[in-house]
């Protein structure tokens, strides 16, 4: 008869024992669960009598925790999935049930195994086993590994994605697998691992029935003591463990049968045709205590708990009469689950916050250092009550070798950081005495590559030294940004809370302008909220304590102005480009560890002079490039060979030439945007303008602009530097300079050469350009001009700066009049002590300057550049024409010795760097692979030993039966010997094991003849033995498992790690990589032999290349010997020279633009032949030699050129260039240099001076050419105007 449709006040507790046992174990846990979800009137200690009562429908409530009667009608279908009815029909006490279970288990042990194996199996399990037997697939043995595999198959599909390291081939189905046996041999073991849930249910049921408050452990201990009194002591100890397992299974069977009975009764009641009461409508109960909201909350929590369990346990929810199966989630045999945490307020959010809070860890502290102060940190974290969650960022790793001693040219910044960070910790009494707060904010700004992040790294390492350690948090601007609303603010708050808990601490924001830009109406509201949060955290109502905030940015003007005030960012440190002294210091730091390969001080001084405009990052890269160039010039063979060669590092000398090659490869960071025309004078133009630039800087520019920190730069000791740092900087007046031409020459190179050279000398100062291109970029010149002037005024508040206005005469023609008036107003507003150098150029003389230029600059501010003097031009053209005397470069490979291979060098460092955790995991993996391989081989070898067909190969041959066996067979072996080797871990690869098995067959075939009956039989057995080996390896051994062992062994060798238990595959050479998969035919040794053969072939090809180049170069050297003797005839010399002329004709035809080039080439050939005759006559009659430039070595060939012709050419160039501008001289020298380069590979250059003189005679200056073009007279015989090249 169906019961009424009432609701009970204890309905929330109607859960099956399985649901309780999955989360809690023991009486205490169930009581906690009862107190959590029970009404106050039903809780323990709150009164309420014995708990008996009646519901509103008239049903009796018993004293037990669960109802006795079925309530299938009272709950919905959804509740049925969470709750399971349970009858408490046990009339025996807990001790009686345990005793009965022990007796039943003893009785079962006497039953034969064939009848015993199905006792602990349900109907579903029997059906499952029968299905697997029909598929001829034996289930795995319930070991730790197989139980984990079974649970992952039925419950966790994502575990199958992990890589299997078993040596068994997975593509074949075999009856016997590695690490498993047929199920019939193992069904005797109780299936404890698969019945954890039901056993836990039995424990809870037993605990519920315990008398006098005894727990499960007390009952089991009492049972154990009773058994010890009855039997032997040793049998009792072993039986105590077995009794617990048998007890679990006995109670499990009772509970399972009881559930099946209840399910069948429920189904039969549902199928009955009797009419149900209250079938027309549901009767809603009267809620007395308004528990609907609490009931919904409880249902939500239970639903969440059920969903969490569903992710781990796949249950069959469609069939109500089928037992819910769930395997163990752990590979442990322990049945006791951990007690739940008693945090009631959102424990999952608390755990998430604890986990994500751990990601905000300082970057300069090790794990051991954090654990030593863990109790203090945890106490602080409880007090701060920070948010929950953080950004998904791991702490950055910082190079611990970087310190303040590795930072050059920034001594003032280092002293300022010490005042902010170190002094408040070391000398707090000073701040306490004067009631002041130390600075808590510093912002680094300056161009890229000037050392902002480097100083932060050095500060992080300095903070971890000494007794008082400072936590250093390093975050980039984008790290704290998130797409979720409010997430960025929460992460900032959590970061500051973590820093406050670990105080004293430092927070470094790299590229802070991306995190806190200027707030405006055009900006997104999210960024404004982030900036507001950062402002409040840095200086809000609650002080941040001993937390220092450091920010770094390349654009200080883009930072929000609210951050740039005392209390937030107290100090602003500018990182400018290093000056001459700073560059010299940086070069000393980067070359200090080169030891004997370090360049000379004179070389470093020259490099520091030439690297004007280079930042610290550029100088570091310059040193790297120079070393690579030096390595290439000393050992070019490493570029042609992929293997490691043995190098003598001490022979690599880094010279100034190597630095020069590296400087041509590098473009400094300050010159890549081309906004500032800073360019030093090269060696050629310095002859013309070097003295002018030097005198101009020393005489017209004050000392304060040349060196900002002059007081500290001139100090001799560190103490003097610290004391003199308090001295005010030198007085720097406001200066205006106008570079213009002279009345005789308007273009003296003031805009193209002198102005960039001056900026290169003053590259440590910030430069603000007012050029036409910078003002007209966005079409709003007034706004661009205002921004540039305001930036210059702000920069002048902290130090000198430069305002640049090139070509003011052209600037006036393009820029609007409003901007011109703004410039005059700006210059008039500057006082005499505003440290701004206003530098401009004028492309004419001051007398011809526009009226506006004379208003801005007075005559005293004008510097006129006169034409170059005669002596200067003579030195200039001597430098240009000196290339005529330069000998052709002949490659001599004999000076480059081929280094030897260095594969087995003990000095070679590991090519793969692994940390301790990675090394430990790799060693663990290699040990596990070796162990699985040995287990696999032992099992297969045991199978071969048990095979009666191969009984002759099990034991060693008896010498009495075969007297000459050990004389004929060199390496006798049997399967017992192989098993002993396996036990001694002598096999680290499958090839060795297979080779020993094959050796048994080869020994049998070698000793036993084929003409005897016994010999034929043994030979047949040996061949069958070989077939069994091949079939076993081919069908059961996975080739990827063998390749995995090789790969892990090679990784350990590359990392320089040697395991203690197992041996590495020492036969694998360095650099080896398998090209074909492993098979029995393609063994590791065969693959290594093929790899070595290919490598030898590559070495032979390399030697052939080197041999061909050596022979060719040697023949060229022998051709160029001047001591060839009279045996060399004139015809041979003519043939060699004519051969070279023919090769040069192709280049001349391609580069020549003269239509009469063929006649010229024929004339050159005739002249060359005449020169050859003259050369031979000169060798035969040395009394009348041809005038040549003598070489320092008499054995080398001399260049055929006339010295008088070169002198006449230089004189012609000096006279022709009278009154020319620097630009015109540079154009002429470029044409002359190009012509000289065409003859760089020739020894006969006698006609070269005449060609150069012809170019100079026909050259016309730009001004004179323009006049002749206007008159129509400027043309040569070919119709080409020589106004350039």
Swiss-Prot record:
Domain named Bromo is located at 928-1032
Q: Which GO terms describe its biological process?
A: nucleosome assembly; nucleosome disassembly; transcription initiation-coupled chromatin remodeling
Which positions in this protein are listed as binding ATP? 446-453
Q: Which GO terms describe its molecular function?
A: ATP binding; ATP hydrolysis activity; chromatin binding; histone binding
Q: Which CDD domains has this protein been placed in? A: Bromo_AAA (cd05528), RecA-like_Yta7-like (cd19517)
Residue spans with biased composition (Basic residues)? 311-325, 1136-1149
The record's keywords, sorted A to Z, are: ATP-binding, Bromodomain, Nucleotide-binding, Transcription
Region labeled Disordered — which residues?
1-95, 121-173, 224-243, 258-359, 1100-1196
Q: Where is the composition biased (Acidic residues)?
A: 226-237, 258-270, 1155-1175
Give the signal peptide, or none. Answer: none
Name the GO cellular-component terms: nucleus
The role this protein plays is: Thought to form a complex that enhances transcription from repetitive DNA sequences by modulating chromatin structure.
- Which family does the UniProt entry place this protein in? Belongs to the AAA ATPase family.
State what protein this is by name. Answer: Tat-binding homolog 7
Q: Which organism is it from?
A: Caenorhabditis briggsae
């Amino acid at each position: 008869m169906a019961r009424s449709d009432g609701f009970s006040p204890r309905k929330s507790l109607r859960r099956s024992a399985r649901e309780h046992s999955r989360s809690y174990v023991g009486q205490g846990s169930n009581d906690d669960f009862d107190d959590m979800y029970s009404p106050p009137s039903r809780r323990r200690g709150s009164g309420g009598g014995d708990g008996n009562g009646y519901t509103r429908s008239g049903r009796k409530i018993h004293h037990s925790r669960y109802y006795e009667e079925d309530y299938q009608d009272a709950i919905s279908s959804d509740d049925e999935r969470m709750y399971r009815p349970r009858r408490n029909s046990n009339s025996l006490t807990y001790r009686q049930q345990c005793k009965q279970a022990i007796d039943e288990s003893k009785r079962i042990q006497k039953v034969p195994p064939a009848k015993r194996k199905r006792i602990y199996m349900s109907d579903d399990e029997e059906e499952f086993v029968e299905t697997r037997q029909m598929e001829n697939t034996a289930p795995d043995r319930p070991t730790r590994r197989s139980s984990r595999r079974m649970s992952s198959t039925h419950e966790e599909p994502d575990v199958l994605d992990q890589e299997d390291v078993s040596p068994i081939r997975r593509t074949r189905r075999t009856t016997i697998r590695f690490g498993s046996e047929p199920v019939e041999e193992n069904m005797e073991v109780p299936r404890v691992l698969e019945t954890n849930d039901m056993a836990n249910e039995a424990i809870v049921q037993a605990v519920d029935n315990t008398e006098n408050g005894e727990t499960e452990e007390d009952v089991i201990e009492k049972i154990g003591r009773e058994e010890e009194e009855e039997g032997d002591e040793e049998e009792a100890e072993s039986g105590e463990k077995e009794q617990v397992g048998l007890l679990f299974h006995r109670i499990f069977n009772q509970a399972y049968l009881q559930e099946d009975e209840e399910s069948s009764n429920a189904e039969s009641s549902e199928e009955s045709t009797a009419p149900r009461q209250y079938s027309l409508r549901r009767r809603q109960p009267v809620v007395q205590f308004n528990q609907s909201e609490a009931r919904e909350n409880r249902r939500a929590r239970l639903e969440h708990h059920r969903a969490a369990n569903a992710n781990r346990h796949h249950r069959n929810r469609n069939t109500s009469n089928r037992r819910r199966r769930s395997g163990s989630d752990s590979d442990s045999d322990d049945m006791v689950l951990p007690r739940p945490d008693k945090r009631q307020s959102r424990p999952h959010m608390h755990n998430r916050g604890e986990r994500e809070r751990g990601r905000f860890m300082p970057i300069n502290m090790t794990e051991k250092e954090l654990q030593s102060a863990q109790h203090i940190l945890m106490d602080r974290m409880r007090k701060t009550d920070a948010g929950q969650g953080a950004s998904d960022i791991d702490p950055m790793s910082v190079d611990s070798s970087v310190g303040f001693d590795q930072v050059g040219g920034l001594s003032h910044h280092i002293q300022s950081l010490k005042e902010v960070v170190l002094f408040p910790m070391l000398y707090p009494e000073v701040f306490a005495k004067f009631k002041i707060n130390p600075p808590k904010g510093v912002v680094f700004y300056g161009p890229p590559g000037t050392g902002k992040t480097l100083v932060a790294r050095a500060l992080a390492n300095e903070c971890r030294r000494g007794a008082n350690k400072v936590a250093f948090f390093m975050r980039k601007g984008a790290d704290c940004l998130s797409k979720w609303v409010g997430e960025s603010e929460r992460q900032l708050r959590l970061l500051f809370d973590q820093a406050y808990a670990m105080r004293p601490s430092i927070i470094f924001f790299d590229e802070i302008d991306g995190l806190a830009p200027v707030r405006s109406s055009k900006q997104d509201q999210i960024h404004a909220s982030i900036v507001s949060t950062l402002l409040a955290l840095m200086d809000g109502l609650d002080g941040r304590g001993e937390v220092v905030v450091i920010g770094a940015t390349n654009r200080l003007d883009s930072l929000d102005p609210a951050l740039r005030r005392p209390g937030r960012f107290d100090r602003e440190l500018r990182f400018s480009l290093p000056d001459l002294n700073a560059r010299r210091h940086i070069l000393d730091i980067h070359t200090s560890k080169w030891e004997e390969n370090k360049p000379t001080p004179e070389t470093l001084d020259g490099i520091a002079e030439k690297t004007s405009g280079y930042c610290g990052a550029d100088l570091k890269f310059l040193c790297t490039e120079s070393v690579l160039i030096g390595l290439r010039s000393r050992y070019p063979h490493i570029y042609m060979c992929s293997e490691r060669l043995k190098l003598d590092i001490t022979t690599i000398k880094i010279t100034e030439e190597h630095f020069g090659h590296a400087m041509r490869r590098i473009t400094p960071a300050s010159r890549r945007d081309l906004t500032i025309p800073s360019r030093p004078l090269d060696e050629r133009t310095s002859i013309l303008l070097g003295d002018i630039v030097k005198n101009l800087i020393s005489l017209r520019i004050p000392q304060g602009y040349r060196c900002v920190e002059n007081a500290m730069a001139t100090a001799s000791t560190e103490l003097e530097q610290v004391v003199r740092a308090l001295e005010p900087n030198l007085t720097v007046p406001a200066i205006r300079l106008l570079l213009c031409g002279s009345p005789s020459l308007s273009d003296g190179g003031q805009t193209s050469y002198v102005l960039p050279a001056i900026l290169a000398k003053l590259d440590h100062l910030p430069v603000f350009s007012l050029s036409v291109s910078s003002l007209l970029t966005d079409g709003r010149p007034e706004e661009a001009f205002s921004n540039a002037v305001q930036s210059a005024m702000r920069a002048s508040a902290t130090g000198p700066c430069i305002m640049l206005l090139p070509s003011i005469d052209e600037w006036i023609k393009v820029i609007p009049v409003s901007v011109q008036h703004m410039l005059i107003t700006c210059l008039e507003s500057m006082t005499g002590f505003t440290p701004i150098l206003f530098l401009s150029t004028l492309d004419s003389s001051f007398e011809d300057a526009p009226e506006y230029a004379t208003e801005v600059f007075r005559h005293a501010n004008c510097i006129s550049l006169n034409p170059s003097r005669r002596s200067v031009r003579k030195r200039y053209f001597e430098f240009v024409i000196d290339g005529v005397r330069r000998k052709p470069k002949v490659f001599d490979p004999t000076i480059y010795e081929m280094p030897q291979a260095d594969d087995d060098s003990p000095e070679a460092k590991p090519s793969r760097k692994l940390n301790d955790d990675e090394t430990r995991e790799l060693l663990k993996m290699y040990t596990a692979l070796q162990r699985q391989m040995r287990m696999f081989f032992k099992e297969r070898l045991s199978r071969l030993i048990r095979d009666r067909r191969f009984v002759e190969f099990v034991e060693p041959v008896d010498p009495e039966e075969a007297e000459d066996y050990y004389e004929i067979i060199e390496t006798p072996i049997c399967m017992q010997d192989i098993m002993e080797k396996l036990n001694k871990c002598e096999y680290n690869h499958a090839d060795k094991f297979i080779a020993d098995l094959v050796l048994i067959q080869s020994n049998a075939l070698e000793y036993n003849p084929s003409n005897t009956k016994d010999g034929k039989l043994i030979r047949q057995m040996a061949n069958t033995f070989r077939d069994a080996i091949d079939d076993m390896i081919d069908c059961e051994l996975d080739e990827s498992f063998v390749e995995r062992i090789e790969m892990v062994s090679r990784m350990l060798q590359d990392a320089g790690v040697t395991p203690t238990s197992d041996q590495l595959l020492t036969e694998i050479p360095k650099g080896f990589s398998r090209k074909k998969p492993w098979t029995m035919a393609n063994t590791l040794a065969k693959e290594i032999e093929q790899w070595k053969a290919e490598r030898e072939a590559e070495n032979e090809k390399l030697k052939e290349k080197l041999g061909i180049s050596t022979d060719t170069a040697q023949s060229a050297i022998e051709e160029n010997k001047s001591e060839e003797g009279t045996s060399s005839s004139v015809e041979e010399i003519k043939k060699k020279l004519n051969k070279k002329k023919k090769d040069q004709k192709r280049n001349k035809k391609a580069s020549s633009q003269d239509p009469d080039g063929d006649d010229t080439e024929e004339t050159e050939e005739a002249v060359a032949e005449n020169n050859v005759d003259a050369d031979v006559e000169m060798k035969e009659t040395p009394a009348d030699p041809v005038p040549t430039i003598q070489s320092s070595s008499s054995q080398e060939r001399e260049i055929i050129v006339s010295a008088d012709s070169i002198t006449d050419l230089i004189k012609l160039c000096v006279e022709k260039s009278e009154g020319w501008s620097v630009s015109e001289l540079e154009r002429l020298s470029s044409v002359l240099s190009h012509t000289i380069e065409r003859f760089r590979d020739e020894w006969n250059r006698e006609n070269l001076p005449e060609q150069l003189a012809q170019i100079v005679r026909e050259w016309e200056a730009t001004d004179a050419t323009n006049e002749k073009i206007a008159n129509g007279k400027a043309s040569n015989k070919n119709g080409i105007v020589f106004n350039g090249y």
